[in-house]
Amino acid sequence: MAVPKHRKSKAKKRSRQAANDKRFLGSLSICPQCGAERMPHRICPECGFYKDRVIKAPKTQNAG
């Protein structure tokens, strides 16, 4: 079985992931909670929901 000879750096990993994320820009889905566009199978960046559960706190704008 193939095993990596050297560890991939964070920059290499994130660069590869960024290239793969561009594929989904044409297939954005609508968040059922807030109606914002989001990438499929990802947490909504606006409300923080995924599959009817709060995963992270929603974005808030500071009044000051």
UniProtKB/Swiss-Prot annotation:
GO cellular component: large ribosomal subunit
Name this protein carries in UniProt: Large ribosomal subunit protein bL32
Domain of life, per lineage: Bacteria
Biased composition (Basic residues): 1-16
Keywords assigned: Ribonucleoprotein, Ribosomal protein
Protein family membership: Belongs to the bacterial ribosomal protein bL32 family.
Keyword Amino-acid biosynthesis: no
